[in-house]
Amino acid sequence: MDGLRQRFERFLEQRNLATEALGALEAKTGVDKRYLATGAATLLSLYLLFGYGAPLLCSLIGFAYPAYASIKAIESPSKEDDTVWLTYWVVYGLFGLAEFFSDLLLSWFPFYYAGKCAFLLFCMAPGPWNGAHMLYHRIIRPLFLKHHEAVDSIVSDISGRALDVAAGMTKDAGKVSVNQLQKAK
């Protein structure tokens, strides 16, 4: 528990949007920012459990900060942070796809959105226990390496067919346009 408390304290000492807002609130109210942060986390957790807009809140938590961090990573000269956030987005996308197909089943689970939010926070957690990193290297990467050649072949075939269809439609549209112009004369 001390490790979690120390990480929490270190987070509150960093300079970012959340800690600046907490600092401003602390200055106005006189309440220590540790208590303000704990209260905000508690309210968010309760809202995820019982609130009306839990799906929206969960989606915002899973998207807003990672999108911001991804933009910062793109703008930084380091490649390592790019890899961290690309890994998160791969896991996020696969999770969203799985969630789409299992939505009817998942809607029966109480507190689903609290669990989903906890999972997404686990996936974006900094450090060696980053959930997206673990899922990618233990599950996604081995499956990808095993099947990527077959998938590449299928995608190449489909894109070739799509280009053929698009070329045919463009040719047909040109003929129709010429016919319409000739009829209009």
Curated annotation (Swiss-Prot):
Transmembrane segments: 43-63, 89-109
Tissue: Expressed in the retina (at protein level).
A Pfam family of this chain: TB2_DP1_HVA22
GO cellular component terms, semicolon-separated: clathrin-coated vesicle membrane; endoplasmic reticulum; endoplasmic reticulum membrane; photoreceptor inner segment
Subcellular location: Endoplasmic reticulum membrane; Cytoplasmic vesicle, Clathrin-coated vesicle membrane
The organism's place on the tree of life at top rank: Eukaryota
Function of the molecule: Required for correct function and survival of retinal photoreceptors. Required for retinal development. In rod photoreceptors, facilitates stability and/or trafficking of guanylate cyclases and is required to maintain endoplasmic reticulum and mitochondrial homeostasis. May play a role in clathrin-coated intracellular vesicle trafficking of proteins from the endoplasmic reticulum to the retinal rod plasma membrane.
Family assignment from sequence similarity: Belongs to the DP1 family.
Protein name (record): Receptor expression-enhancing protein 6
Native source species: Bos taurus (Bovine)
